[in-house]
Amino acid sequence: MSKNKIALICFKPNNIYLEFLNKFNYEVYIIIDDNSVNYNALYQTKYSNLKFIQIQEELCKRYGFTNVNKIGVKKLVSGWDKALCYFSLNFSNTNSNTNSNTNSNTNSNTNSNTNSNFNTWFIEDDVFFHSEDTLLKIDAKYPDYDLLANSDFSPATNMNEWLWSSIKIKTKGPYYCGMMCATRMSQRVLNSIRVYATTYNELFFLEALFPTLTKEANLELKCCCPDELKTVVYRHNYVYQDFVKNKDNIYHPIKNILEHVEFRK
């Protein structure tokens, strides 16, 4: 298996997170929603191990990468849409020749026809983990799963519950949901996302999108909820002792980036 990748999804990059990720051996991509500044030109010299990706909204709309976090941020095209657009079109083991169109403000030399297999961590910037070793341990423990996420992967039985009434899915159920603020996907999951976007010219809310499309493939794709991701939740007030006790988990949400620094001491 080729080296796994990390995609940090943010509106604007934060120097503390960039400093942290710049030391990693993973291939790290910073997916930036804001297009007011060329961040590659601004940061590439200082953070030479990071790849800064910016994509125009119109390109996402053209390829059907919309609605992924409209419920959360009230935008048709968000950083999540841009992340999935970039990785699904460039890294999903297809013959799609879209790489030259999706490399906007990046130093990445991406081959969309890659034959190597790897997984990608998609992480929002209010997600905390202690070190690169946290991800390496999870990768070593669960090498063969297509989707790792905090979900029980049980089909929804009441579409009047949760957010189902606000989510439009164009394939037949069953449907699934979970917390997807930090999740690891294989290229096969990315390909399922690309196929849906191409077919229906839109996607749907990420907390239903990833588990539903993965489970839709029946036995072809494998999903798992590791204990290490059960601390990725909608809302929780974490304290320092939580991380002292368990440095193997990934945590969400911790929105104050200065707390990330404190919690890593």
Residue ranges and their predicted role:
Residues 117-128:
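Short beta-strand-to-loop acidic/aromatic patch adjacent to the donor-nucleotide binding site
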